[in-house]
Amino acid sequence: MRHLSSLHRHGIPVLAPLVLLVACSSGGAGTPSAGTPDASAAAGPSADTASPSRVLDADPARLPRDREAALDLIGRVIADPDSFGPGVVRRSPYESGPATWPVLGADCAWHQEKPAGNVLATLTRSFEVPAAQGKGPVRLSAVVTVHRTREDARWEMAESIEETMRCPTQQLQEGERIGSMVSAALLGGESGQTTSEDALSESGQYSSTALGGPHAYVWQQAQSLRFTVAATGKGAEGRTEEEISDLVVQGMATMLVRIESAVEKQS
C-alpha cells in the first residue's frame, strides 16, 4: 500500500492488513473488510506475543464527567484546518450538531442519529483542500467522541470493524459510495503502536456523482481511554492515495497529541 510510509513519519505505526475483500457491484465499488466484535479481539496478538499496551496516564481531575465538560474538551482537541497541513480550509457546514452522530443503518447507508446513551459528547468537522492545477478537491473530516467509560470506547472500535464486514459497500452521503477496502487493526504495544490503545485503518475506493471516481479513500480511527478520534480523506481526479493518507495521518496525529496534552498527569 503506497500510503503506509507516511504513518511512520508521524509516529503512527503501519497496521498489518487483516482481510482484503474485493466484490463487484453495479457501481464498480468493492467490499470493505472486517470481523465481528468478538473476532476483533481474536485478530489481535496472543497473550504470549503481545507487548504491553500503552495506556495514557491521565489525571482523573482532567477527565470530563458531564456533557458540558466533554464538549469543552472536544473543542480543544478536535482538528482544525491547520491540523492537516497547509492549504486545508473549512467546508460548509463546518460542524455537525453535537446532538447527532453518524450511524450505519441496515441499508448500509450512513445516517445522522441521536448519539448512543454511552456517549457523553461527539463532534464532527468537515474540511477541504480546494481544487487546483488540474486536481480535484480533497474532502476531509474529523470526529472526536467522549464515551462514559473506556469499555464503551473500545466497543465503538469493535463495532467499526463489524460494520465493514456487514456492508459490502457503503453509502456515505447521497451520491457517495466507498468500496474495495483494505482494513487493518493494531493494539497498543504491538509493532510499535504507542500513540493509542487501539487503532484501525482502511483504504480503498471512493466514488461520487459530483467528483466521479473511483478515487482514493482513507479512513483511520484510534481509541485512548474514553476517547475515540477518527479522520477521513476522500480523493478526486489527480490526487494520489499517498497524498490523501498524509493528510489523514497528520490530522490524526494532531488530535491524539492534543488529547494527551489535555488529560495527562502534570509533573
Positions of the model-derived regions?
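Short, surface-exposed beta-strand/loop micro-motifs that present aromatic residues
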Residues: A216-S224
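Short, well-ordered beta-strand elements
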Residues: L140-V143, R226-G235
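Sec-dependent bacterial lipoprotein signal peptides
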Residues: M1-V22
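A small/polar (G/S/T-enriched), proline-flanked helix-loop surface module common
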Residues: P52, L56-P60, V88-Y217, G251, ...
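A short acidic/glycine-rich loop-to-helix N-cap element
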Residues: G233-Q250
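Extracytoplasmic/secreted envelope proteins and their assembly/folding machinery
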Residues: L71, G75-P81, R154-I161, V249-M252, ...
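N-terminal low-complexity, Pro/Thr-rich disordered segments
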Residues: L18-D72, E260-S267
